[in-house]
């Protein structure tokens, strides 16, 4: 689960992480009032959406007066903010965060996430703050400092100091950085976060270490332990299809292609997407209906796929083990009839009750394109999407 910058800073504040003062605003007048509360000097007006790169898209502006803060908020609220992470449609800005300005001496990067190759939490730091860290890692991997944390000891002071020295810090700034990194680590662990990222982490002219921006993601499977964090979910920032999928316990991720996919099993779903790509097509989604789906769940999955206007063809790839092919077939028929299927549908079934499933589809009066293996199914789906 993702949350907004202002929410992440609210959490980090509780763990002693230094963040600038700021106030949320949902109207231009509220933004003006927030700037006045901050003293009426220089402030930053920041669009709150679940995406990075806001500054490049016009989503972060400096205001030198409360009146200017109101003007910036007026321009931002309601705009479709486009960044490299939003896609071409952009995301609507519904709220802004007005934050006090500070005199910046240096911009750095500090982040924490799980290194799945090693099976440990990795703390990463870089002198290249305020820019796309993925780009830095790709072009200048030597500029990324890393420390791997033992779950038995947690982040040790010597590790935080080693990062600070690697960033070129000295004197009181080292002490402040160690305190900052320790607070960030404590917040990460205590909240079951999957990502905690400060970009940029700034060193002010006065030597303070501040989180100028903050991003936190959380493990959905641990949210039952954190009702306060679960309450921070913003449905307006989530894809409606993904929200609907969660209601039916479906694993769905929207992508940019035009071939809808419905598969049982995450591994088979990823393999299906790979074969579609190898066949010259682009998958429109990842969708795993799981091993114990019933007809209603399959129907819901089918409707979610078809609700994407970019989908030109659908590929259903089912290997029936616990999931029976006849259940999938009945769900396909029910959903196709309910939504009035008008795009090509390619179905590949194999496994338990496969003959019964094929018979159900054959007698459904639907224009279904059958396939006997995954390669054939992918090729037919790509051809159908191109012809649509």
From Swiss-Prot:
InterPro entries (alphabetical): ATP-grasp_succ-CoA_synth-type, ATP_grasp_subdomain_1, Succ-CoA_synthase_bsu_CS, SUCC_ACL_C, Succ_CoA_ligase-like_bsu, Succinyl-CoA_synth-like
Lineage top rank: taxon: Bacteria
Molecular functions (GO terms): ATP binding; magnesium ion binding; succinate-CoA ligase (ADP-forming) activity; succinate-CoA ligase (GDP-forming) activity
Database matches in SUPFAM superfamilies: Glutathione synthetase ATP-binding domain-like, Succinyl-CoA synthetase domains
GO cellular component: cytosol; succinate-CoA ligase complex
Gene3D superfamilies: ATP-grasp fold, A domain, ATP-grasp fold, B domain, Succinyl-CoA synthetase domains
Cofactor: Mg(2+)
Residues reported to bind ATP: 46, 53-55, 99, 102, 107
Statement: the UniProt record of this protein carries the keyword Ligase: yes
Pathway(s) the chain acts in: Carbohydrate metabolism; tricarboxylic acid cycle; succinate from succinyl-CoA (ligase route): step 1/1
ATP-grasp domain sequence ranges: 9-244
Alphabetized Pfam families for the sequence: ATP-grasp_2, Ligase_CoA
One GO-annotated biological process of the protein: succinyl-CoA metabolic process
The record's free-text note on cofactor binding: Binds 1 Mg(2+) ion per subunit.
Alphabetized UniProt keyword annotations: ATP-binding, Ligase, Magnesium, Metal-binding, Nucleotide-binding, Tricarboxylic acid cycle
Family: Belongs to the succinate/malate CoA ligase beta subunit family.
Database matches in HAMAP family: Succ_CoA_beta
Subunit structure, as described in the record: Heterotetramer of two alpha and two beta subunits.
Protein name according to UniProt: Succinate--CoA ligase [ADP-forming] subunit beta
Species per Swiss-Prot/TrEMBL record: Anaeromyxobacter dehalogenans (strain 2CP-C)
